[in-house]
Each structure stands twice: as C-alpha cells, then as structure tokens.
C-alpha cells in the first residue's frame, strides 16, 4: 500500500480504546416517543465512575464494542447507538445507581421479544467493569408494541367465552404434581371441576413422562371437563400443558387440544422460550384457544435485588409475546412478592395505560394502546382464610388458584372445591354490599362456614397455616 493510499484510508479513524462515556453518556439527550427506554440498576466495579458504567451498559447493549473499529465510519452512530441519558444514586445503597438508557427503535426486529432481549439483556450482563447489573423496568413505545399480536384473546374475550362475570375465576393445580396415572389424574380434575372450580391445571413439570404420556392425560382431562360441564351447567377448563422439547411437538399437542374441544392450553414461557411462546400464542388466537402461562424459572432471573431482571419486565415481555393468564405471586402465600411491587406489575398486565409510579416500582409511563390485557394468577400456598385478602388485592380480573388448598381438604377433592367456591362467593357478595374485606375478612369467612360444612372443615384445617417471611425484592426507600 502506498503512503498516499494509507493516509486516505486513515482519515477519520484512529485506532485504540476510548472511554465509553465520550460517546454513549449524553445527559442532555431528549428522549423520543419511539425510543425503547430502560432503567438499569448498575453496581460498578471499584474505581469505575458511574458515568462510565452507565455508558458501558448503553454501548454494550447497542452498537459499541471494546475498541474503536474502522467500520464505525460506514454507519451513523448518532442514529443507532444507545444513550445513557440519566443517572441517579439508589437511596440507602452504596455504589448503586439507576442508569436510564434510550434505544432507537430501528435496533430491534418487529414483533420479536427474542431479538429485543438479546440486545438489552445480552452480553452486557457479563461485562467485567460491572459488579452487578439489573434491568428494573422497560418502556415499550406504541410504535413497537403495535408490531406484536399480544395475548391471543384478552380478558374481556375470555369472560365472554366462559360466560363468567363479576368475580375472580377459581382454579386448582392437580397434586401430587408428578406420579399420578392419567386415569387418576382425570378423576381429580373431574372432582375439582364438579365441586365448583372454573379451571384445573397441569403443574409446570407435567409434560409427557413415562408415568403419564401427554395424549393419555389430554383424553382423560377432556372427558372430565365434559362430564363436569354437563352436571353443573357451567363452562369448565383444564390447562393442558403443551410445553415440549421442540416447537413442532408443542404445536402438535395444541392441535390435539383443539380437536378435543377444550377451551385452554398452557405453556412454560421462560423454560420454553419466547420464540416458542409467540408461536403458540399465534396458534391459539387463530384456533380459538385460551393460553395460560406459567413462569417457571423466573426466580432464577428476578429474585436477586442487584442482578438479573425484575419480573415487571418479564411480565411486559409476556404481554407482548402472548398469553391470557400468567402467574403473578400472591402477596399472602408461600411465594415471593411484596404488595406494592406485585400490584404494580399486575396493573402493567391488565391496564391499557399505566402512569409512572416509583412507589410501586414503575419507572416509566406505559401506554399499551389497544393490546389486550392478561389475567394475573395468584397461586402458591393459599387457602380459604386468604380468600378475602386475595379478592381485595387482585379484584375481579384475576384467577385465584388453590392447589393444596383444594386437594388437601380432609373430606376430599370435591368438598375442597366447594369450600373455595363458597368462600369466594361470600367475599364477592360482602364486597358488593360495601363491607371492608381487609378488616372484616375473617368474620365473613366464619359467617359463611356456618351454612357450609365443607368450608367449616377447611377453616379448621388451615387456621394456623401462615407463611411469614420478609420479601427479598423490596422497594428502595
């Protein structure tokens, strides 16, 4: 190469490493309505300035790499780069900051949660300059959310399909979760639905194991559903878990469920993956199936307060990817969940427009426009004494799911279902009459138990059961 050519090639390009903050920290940037906005909890390594850490997050999750490259000159970094536009210290924490990052919409493929997460929560989480990193919240602009189908049907369509209004829906996870034969499993499903529940559910672990192959389970559960419907006059459902080792097998199971005429199938969306989940959601919308979503594996991602991703982000991702129900904790049961935080992401699942509210952990105003809502499912360590609190906390647009709280009844499965249905109807009636469920809840249950022996027996069994542990994931004070 001649000296003259070498000089021309090097114009505007200087090899080497430069601080991220020189390019990616832009505190004067005015965010656009079309930007995807992220709030990261950043814990820099000792000696790394917070501005450099925030800029590094913006760079490594968008266009940046560890050194200057000459191909930067072949594109417009100003158009495509992520920008750290704000930093604030976390109250009560040493060396933790909330870094606000804006991403141009053109960085992401339309209708793909997989692509969005590959960038925003990809390699940057292993970056050595950061001791820990957590994605606290994400603002998805309407320009991007409108490229998604979202939930297959949504809350109102589900109520119309089921012809059930004015109260939470009642469910039950069949236990023991593993080991039952398909015939005995179907028997438990029938007894619970016959006793008054709206739904029963496969546990997330139930796929197609040697003790109960999926097709056998589907057939016995369908028989149980039709028998219970005929005897009660109510529409019933069982969440048939279609999760499988391949997308093709998953769709095959969903096709079988549709051919059996059942109303709903189920998917483990984190272990199954967002691509598989979106594919199943599209199939469900096209074929009239409701889709129940289980969040197995979420705590691996969201439970640590300084690293990972908050569940409110996973909830938003699910609303984009597609699901009509999703598990959302209980506040009062055995699983993690502080009240204000839980109600924050419950609103993000159900409502069309959610205002920024840091007291509930919501960092950005979120406008879903017309994307259908998702029913939150309260499940895990709950029983009849929790019914007033659950009805008051979650309201009508929810599913209250009692596994052990139904099947653990001393008289059997059907009386357990009766006890839960009576408790729910008593709480809804009391609320509609203007009574305070939070203050009078126990009295309401005791009054109802006087004319329901099934409820009285349940009250006696679970009167001392509590799960009183402090939540790990709490709001910053």
From Swiss-Prot:
GO terms for biological process: photorespiration; reductive pentose-phosphate cycle. The record marks 334 as: Transition state stabilizer. Residues 1-2 form a propeptide. GO terms for cellular component: chloroplast. It is found in: Plastid, Chloroplast. RuBisCO catalyzes two reactions: the carboxylation of D-ribulose 1,5-bisphosphate, the primary event in carbon dioxide fixation, as well as the oxidative fragmentation of the pentose substrate in the photorespiration process. Both reactions occur simultaneously and in competition at the same active site. This is Ribulose bisphosphate carboxylase large chain. The gene is rbcL.
């Amino acid at each position: 190469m001649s000296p003259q050519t070498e000089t021309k090639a090097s114009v505007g390009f200087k090899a080497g490493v430069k601080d991220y903050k020189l390019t990616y920290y832009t505190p004067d940037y005015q965010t656009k309505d079309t930007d995807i906005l992220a709030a990261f909890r950043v814990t820099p390594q000792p000696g790394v300035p917070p501005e450099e850490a925030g800029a590094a997050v913006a760079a490594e999750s968008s266009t940046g790499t560890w050194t200057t490259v000459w191909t930067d000159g072949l594109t417009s970094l100003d158009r495509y780069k992520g920008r750290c536009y704000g930093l604030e210290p976390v109250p009560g924490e040493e060396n933790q900051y909330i870094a606000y990052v804006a991403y141009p919409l053109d960085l992401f493929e339309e209708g793909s949660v997989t692509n969005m997460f590959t960038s925003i929560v990809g390699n940057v989480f292993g970056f050595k300059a950061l001791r820990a990193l957590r994605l606290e919240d994400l603002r998805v602009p309407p320009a991007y959310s409108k490229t998604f189908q979202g939930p297959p049907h949504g809350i109102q369509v589900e109520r119309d399909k089921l012809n059930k209004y004015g109260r939470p829906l009642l469910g039950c996870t069949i236990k023991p979760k593993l080991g039952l034969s398909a015939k005995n499993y179907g028997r438990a499903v029938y007894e619970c639905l016959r006793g008054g529940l709206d739904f029963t559910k496969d546990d997330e672990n139930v796929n197609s194991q040697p003790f109960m192959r999926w097709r056998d389970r589907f057939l016995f559960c369908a028989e149980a559903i039709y028998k219970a419907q005929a005897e009660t006059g109510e529409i019933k459902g069982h969440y048939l878990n279609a999760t499988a080792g391949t997308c093709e097998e998953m769709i095959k199971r969903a096709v079988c469920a549709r051919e059996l005429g059942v109303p709903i199938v189920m998917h483990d969306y984190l272990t199954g993956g967002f691509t598989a989940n979106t594919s199943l959601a599209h199939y469900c919308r096209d074929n009239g199936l409701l889709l129940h979503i289980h969040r197995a594996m979420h705590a691996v991602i969201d439970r640590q307060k300084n690293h990972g991703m908050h569940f409110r982000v996973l909830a938003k991702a699910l609303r984009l990817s597609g699901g009509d129900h999703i598990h959302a904790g209980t506040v009062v049961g055995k699983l993690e969940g502080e009240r204000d935080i839980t109600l924050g992401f419950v609103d993000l699942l159900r409502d069309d427009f959610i205002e920024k509210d840091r007291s509930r952990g919501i960092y950005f105003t979120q406008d879903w426009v017309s994307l259908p809502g998702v029913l939150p499912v309260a499940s895990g360590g709950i029983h009849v004494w929790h019914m007033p609190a659950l009805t008051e906390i979650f309201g009508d647009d929810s599913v209250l799911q009692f596994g052990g709280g139904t099947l653990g009844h001393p008289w059997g499965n059907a009386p357990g279902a009766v006890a839960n249905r009576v408790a729910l109807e008593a709480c809804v009636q009391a609320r509609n009459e203007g009574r305070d469920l939070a203050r009078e809840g126990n009295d309401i249950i005791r009054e109802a138990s006087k004319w329901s022996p099934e409820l009285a027996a349940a009250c006696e069994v679970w009167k001392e059961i509590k799960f009183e542990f402090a939540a790990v994931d709490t709001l910053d004070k």
